[in-house]
Amino acid sequence: MLDLMIRGLRLEAPGILGLELVATDGSPLPTFEAGAHLDLHLPGGLVRPYSLCNAPGETHRYCLAVLLDPASRGGSRAVHEQLRVGQHLTTSAPRNLFPLVAESSRSLLFAGGIGITPILAMAQVLAARGDTFELHYCVRSRRLAAFIDWLEASTFAAHVHLHADDGPTPFDATALLRDAGDAHLYVCGPGGFMEHVLGCARTAGWDETRLHREYFAAPVQPAGDARAFEGRLARSGLTLQVPAERSVAQVLDDAGVCIPLACEQGICGTCLTRVLDGEPEHRDSFLTDAERARNDQFTPCCSRARSACLVLDL
């Protein structure tokens, strides 16, 4: 764990707060790769992952930007309302679930709204390497585009394309993805935006191995489709009943079984747990289709069981 201090807070766009974090003792911070995130331990015991958006070569600071979500479960609201300059925060070391491919002839970076944060770090790395890339930044309005002035003044401004709903340059994912070649696509943003972009890429013949994405929020699950099941913990010998209205993670916590949690939506993989027997009902946005098909792990923060019982490696 890292002990950091908030050195700066800045409103990057309406509803988007930028944070600059430094080591409390002034020492260099652990290095990170483009696409990485920190798990912030926030007031009230909340832990939430936020993407690093500064240049990965920087070791004197970490920069984040957090959108105040009207449907916040506490994380973004705590950041906006409770954090102050000079305050200390505990965080994880940087972790990367959305890495750049080491060698690619061309990269297409698609960001929707606050999805610009990991994409911003990627653009800085690609520019520093001299790689061929395009950054397409989609927002409802230019005034809502965090970092746009910085991007348009950057050394790679010619690679940046802003698509605002109220602007002159409409976003046409089909046209942009038509001639894929051997390019790699990186997309981050709201779920609907991401599914549209990925759907256009698949229709255009892109191979799944060249599609990279990171979700910031889980898809909404249909109401009333959850059912109760039994969870058996192989190592501790406990048998727990998981009611329809509660998650496995909540039931484990009630029983005093601690597992690591961060997003609590199935998007970060922090709580990934081995399944020894039974069939999970995967509701996460973290595992690949191939990983889901093996049914040997699941995310207890949101996923459930298709079988009457799951045996977990806990």
Curated annotation (Swiss-Prot):
User: Which ranges carry the 2Fe-2S ferredoxin-type domain?
Assistant: 229-314
User: Which terms does the UniProt entry file under GO BP?
Assistant: lignin catabolic process
Q: Which residues bind NAD(+)?
A: 105-217
Q: Which cofactor does it need?
A: FMN
Residue span, FAD-binding FR-type domain: 1-101
InterPro entries with a match to the protein in the record: 2Fe-2S_ferredoxin-like_sf, 2Fe-2S_ferredoxin-type, 2Fe2S_fd_BS, Beta-grasp_dom_sf, FAD-bd_FR_type, FNR_nucleotide-bd, MRET, Riboflavin_synthase-like_b-brl
Q: Which UniProt keywords apply?
A: 2Fe-2S, Aromatic hydrocarbons catabolism, Electron transport, Flavoprotein, FMN, Iron, Iron-sulfur, Lignin degradation, Metal-binding, NAD, Oxidoreductase, Transport
Q: Which Pfam families match?
A: Fer2
* EC category name: oxidoreductase
Q: Where does [2Fe-2S] cluster bind?
A: 263, 268, 271, 302
GO MF entries:
2 iron, 2 sulfur cluster binding; metal ion binding; oxidoreductase activity
Q: What is its EC number?
A: 1.14.13.-
Q: In which pathway does it act?
A: Xenobiotic degradation; vanillyl-alcohol degradation
**PANTHER family named in the record:** CARNITINE MONOOXYGENASE REDUCTASE SUBUNIT (PTHR47354:SF1), NADH OXIDOREDUCTASE HCR (PTHR47354)
Similarity-based family = Belongs to the PDR/VanB family.
Q: What is this protein called?
A: Vanillate O-demethylase oxidoreductase
Protein species of origin: Pseudomonas sp. (strain ATCC 19151)
